[in-house]
Design a protein with these regions (language model features):
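General beta-strand structural signal in soluble alpha/beta enzymes
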Residues: 57, 115-119
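Long, positively charged amphipathic alpha-helical accessory segments at protein N-termini or as interdomain linkers
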Residues: 2-9, 18-19, 87-115, 125-252
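A generic structural signal for short beta-strands and their flanking turns/coil linkers
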Residues: 51, 76-78, 119, 151, ...
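N-terminal lobe of the biotin/lipoate ligase/transferase fold
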Residues: 1-109, 129-131, 231-235
């Protein structure tokens, strides 16, 4: 499966040369997040990661998203976790969740899928019956002291798999191979490479992601309504209260 993914990924590369990857593909696992964590514990370098690593599974038994919520992961979707080289200095590094969400959204839009970003870490497919969840991200950073060693991203993308109420897949998208998971996995790898290229461009990532952000409801906090006013560089949601006070809401 690794060779097939790499071949399809190279076929999607218009100009850029092949990016090195260390891949592990599994028929089934409890969680790609767990598998990646074990791999990194055993073999990761002491300092920064230099070659991206990725674990992909045909299906997961216990996939999870934000705050431990279960993510349905049957065969037919793309279920993976990746460790990505990232700038060591936090002040110049883009938020990995924003960078990956932006890169994946742009890749899907370029192939005809109308998508938006839902804060904090979801991609929505715009359908005739309204927006539906298409993908979810689980981002993070591995630090040593104040320096970044690598970024981590867990990703679930609905391809041909059955989906629960409120979600969508890509079966009806001819530009995306009608959701064929191997081709979609290659597309995701290309999006991850794009995210790595954007990793040192925090402001470009923030503005790009903000342009694709779905409308966000007002937030009731501290006894008052706060209006969303875009994104902070770290991916937090900027909120403004009626008296002009500002705060950042973070859920990642």
């Amino acid at each position: 499966m690794n060779g097939a993914i790499q071949a399809k990924r190279r076929a999607l590369a218009a100009v850029e040369g092949p990016h090195p990857w260390r891949l592990r593909s599994l028929a089934v696992c409890a969680s790609t997040e767990t598998e990646l964590g074990r791999w990194l514990e055993r073999q990761a370098p002491a300092e920064q990661l230099t070659v991206p690593r990725l674990v992909v599974a045909r299906r997961q038994c216990f996939g999870h998203g934000q705050q431990g919520r279960r993510w349905e992961s049957p065969a037919g979707g793309v279920w993976l976790s990746a460790a990505l080289p990232w700038p060591a200095e936090p002040q110049v590094a883009a938020a990995p969740g924003l960078a990956v969400a932006l890169a994946l959204a742009e890749a899907l839009i370029a192939r005809g899928a109308p998508v938006q970003l839902k804060w904090p870490n979801d991609l929505l497919l715009l359908t005739p019956t309204g927006p539906r969840k298409l993908a979810g991200l689980l981002p993070g950073l591995r630090l040593r002291g104040s320096r970044i060693r690598w970024a981590r991203i867990g990703l679930g993308l609905n391809g041909r798999n059955p989906v629960p109420a409120g979600a969508a897949n890509l079966r009806q998208q001819p530009g995306l191979w009608h959701g064929e998971p191997l081709a979609l996995t290659a597309l995701v790898l290309r999006a991850l490479e794009r995210a790595m290229a954007l990793a040192g461009e925090a402001e470009a990532v923030r503005t790009g992601a903000e342009a694709l952000l779905a409308p966000t409801d007002p937030q009731w906090l501290e006894g008052a309504w706060w209006q969303p006013q875009g994104l902070a560089p770290d991916g937090g949601l900027r909120l403004v209260r009626g008296d002009g006070r500002e705060r950042i809401l973070r859920r990642f």
